[in-house]
Amino acid sequence: TFEPDFVMLAQNEGFRLMTLVTRSTSQEHIDREFAWAKSQREDSPETVSFATTISMENWDDPDWQEVTISRLRQDFDSGASAVKVWKDIGMTFRDSDGSFIMIDNPRFDPILEYIASQHKPVIGHLGEPRNCWLPVDSMTVPGDSSYFANHPEYHMYLHPEYPSYDDQINARDNMLAKHPDLIFVGAHLGSLEWDIGELAQRLDRFPNMAVDIAARISHLQIQDRDTVREFIINYQDRLLYGTDAGVSESTESVEWIAERWHRDWLYFTTDSVLTSPEVRGPFEGLGLPVSVLRRIYYQNAQAWLGM
C-alpha cells in the first residue's frame, strides 16, 4: 500500500497487513519493492509484516542458486517473514531451451530446502483460477471475466501453447511432495477455487499446506452453501482470510477496502441472504461459529505466517 490511511483503517478495524514483494523479473525491481515493504514494517511494526521473493534474473548462471539463497538470508535478517512466489513462475519465465520454468524444476530444490530449514513459509500464487482456461463468457464469476478480459496476456484460453491448468496444479503438487517440510500457503485457495472437494484432497495429502481465501470468496459463494460451511469448519486451521487488496493512487480506495471487509464479514458471520457485485444472483451467508471465525481471521495468520 502507498496510502497511510489504509494502515490506519486496518489499525482501527483490528486487521493486520502483509505486504508481498511480487514479480521475479529482476533484482532491481525486488530491491525497490523490498525497501518499501521494509519501511512500512518499520513505520507500523504492530500492523505490517512483509514477504520477499526470489529473482529469476540470471536463472541460467551456475551460481544462481547460491546467489538466491544468499539474498534470502539477507532478506530474512532484514525482517522478511515469508517468501512469495508468483504466477510468472509457470506462466512467463522460460528455460534456455524455451520450455516454461515450473515450480517443480529441480533448480528450485536447494532454495526451497533452505526456506524450509529457516521455518519460513512460501506463499504461492501458482497458476490461475480454472476460469483462466475458459472463454470469457463461460467463466463462473464476473471478477474473473473482467480480469481476464483486461489481461489477455494471462488469459490462457487465448494461449493454448502455454502450460495447461492441470500442468500448473501438478507442478505445485510435485513440488510439495518433494519438500514435505516446507510450510506452504497457497494463495487464492491454492488455485483450486472451483471445487472445495479438490482442495480438501490436497489439504489431506499435504499437512504443511494451508490456503488463503483472498480474491476467491466469490467462488465459495457460488458453491453449495452447506458443503462450503462444512468444509470451512472441517479445515478451519488451514484457511486464512485475506483480500489481495492494496491502496495507492491507481488502485482501490480505502472506502472500497472497508466495504469489502464488511461484506465478507456478513458472509462468514450471518446466514442472511446476500448479494455481491462479484456473484451473479443472491447467496446465503455461512453463519460460522465464533471459534472458527477466530481461526480464519486471526489465529491461522499467526500460526502460518507469523503475523
What is the predicted role of each segment?
Residues 1, 17-20, 48-53, 83-85, ...:
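Hydrophobic faces of well-ordered beta-strands that scaffold small-molecule active sites
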Residues 28-31, 62, 66, 102, ...:
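Conserved phosphate-coordination/catalytic loops
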Residues 156-160, 164-307:
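H/E-rich (His + Asp/Glu) clusters that bind or coordinate divalent metals
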Residues 2-5, 25-26, 57-59, 90-92, ...:
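Active-site environment of divalent metal-dependent phosphoester hydrolases
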Residues 11-16, 77, 298-302, 306:
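Sec-exported extracytoplasmic/periplasmic mature domains
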